[in-house]
């Protein structure tokens, strides 16, 4: 379990997260919804260890507790933490002309037995991760020439390579934290990526927290929904329980209605 308890985050005297608690369970995809500026990326940063709880971090005051598999997050050293959780931040374009394969291989360095010494097996994992991300054709491409959507798929392959399970070894639960992974993707690739995330959450026993802006995507691909507004979780639970007009209006300040899609999976959320 990756859990945060009673988080308070403030920056420049302004509260960003206020007494927030959340649990990310292995084998489960949790979608985090909220309007722009609600604190979603801040929460993900705290859970990732980029904003450590218990003091000042990057100009923010952070209070509260975060634990990963029962261990305080701040007590886990960086190499071990990198093997237990992977983070896909919002889109950022590399400044150097790495190939897509070289970017994906960055995810394997936490597993190297000697600094910088990757193996043939790491290369095989990179190839499989690119295939899972639908990015095999981009293998040799210079990442500075890729479109936003192509780069997003390569970076997704990188975090898959980072959490790739070793053969025959029991693994502690691991966690995948995704910040708007579908923002640059077309319709088909949005659903393909989230389908892959949900399948791997079960096959690899991953706890997943993904920030998404489209509640319709969350309804179809998440096991649980957490809605964030004014620095607090205002609703959380199964999609059918949470994605209703009243909680959505509270989360987004926007009235919606539900339309039967006719497929028995989830209703479509449209403006009221």
UniProtKB/Swiss-Prot annotation:
Give me the Gene Ontology terms describing cellular component. plasma membrane
Question: Keywords in UniProt for this one?
Answer: ATP-binding, Cell inner membrane, Cell membrane, Membrane, Nucleotide-binding, Translocase, Transport
User: By its UniProt entry, which PROSITE patterns does this protein fall under?
Assistant: ABC_TRANSPORTER_1, ABC_TRANSPORTER_2, HMUV
Segments forming domain ABC transporter: 2-255
Membrane-protein topology: Peripheral membrane protein
Q: Where in or outside the cell is it found?
A: Cell inner membrane
Under the GO molecular function aspect, what terms does this record hold? ATP binding; ATP hydrolysis activity
Q: What is its EC number?
A: 7.6.2.-
Which PANTHER family does the protein's record reference? HEMIN IMPORT ATP-BINDING PROTEIN HMUV
Q: How does it assemble?
A: The complex is composed of two ATP-binding proteins (HmuV), two transmembrane proteins (HmuU) and a solute-binding protein (HmuT).
Q: Which family does it belong to?
A: Belongs to the ABC transporter superfamily. Heme (hemin) importer (TC 3.A.1.14.5) family.
Q: What does this protein do?
A: Part of the ABC transporter complex HmuTUV involved in hemin import. Responsible for energy coupling to the transport system.
- List the protein's name: Hemin import ATP-binding protein HmuV
What is the native source organism of this protein?
A: Burkholderia mallei (strain ATCC 23344)
Instruction: Provide the gene name from the record.
Output: hmuV
């Amino acid at each position: 379990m990756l859990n945060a308890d009673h988080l308070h985050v403030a920056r420049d005297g302004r509260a960003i997260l206020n007494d927030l608690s959340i649990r990310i369970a292995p084998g489960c995809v949790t979608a985090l919804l909220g309007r722009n500026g609600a604190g979603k990326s801040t929460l993900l940063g705290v859970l990732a260890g980029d904003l450590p709880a218990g003091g000042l971090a990057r100009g923010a005051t952070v209070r509260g507790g975060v634990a990963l598999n029962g261990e305080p997050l701040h007590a886990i050293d960086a190499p071990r933490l990198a093997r237990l959780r992977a983070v896909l931040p919002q889109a950022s374009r590399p400044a150097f002309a790495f190939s897509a394969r070289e970017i994906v291989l960055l995810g394997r360095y936490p597993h190297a037995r000697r600094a910088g010494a990757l193996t043939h097996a790491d290369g095989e994992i990179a190839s499989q991760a690119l295939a899972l991300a639908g990015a095999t054709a981009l293998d040799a491409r210079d990442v500075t020439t890729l479109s936003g959507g192509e780069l997003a798929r390569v970076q997704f392959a990188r975090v898959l390579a980072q959490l790739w399970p070793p053969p025959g070894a029991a693994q502690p639960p691991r966690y995948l934290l995704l910040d708007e992974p579908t923002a640059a993707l077309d319709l088909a690739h949005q659903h393909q990526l989230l389908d892959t995330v949900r399948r791997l959450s079960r096959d690899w026993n991953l706890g997943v927290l993904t920030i998404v802006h489209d509640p319709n995507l969350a309804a179809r691909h998440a096991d649980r929904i957490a809605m964030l507004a004014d620095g607090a979780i205002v609703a959380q639970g199964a999609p059918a329980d949470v994605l209703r007009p009243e909680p959505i209006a509270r989360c987004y300040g926007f009235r919606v209605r539900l339309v039967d899609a006719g497929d028995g999976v989830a209703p479509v959320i449209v403006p009221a």
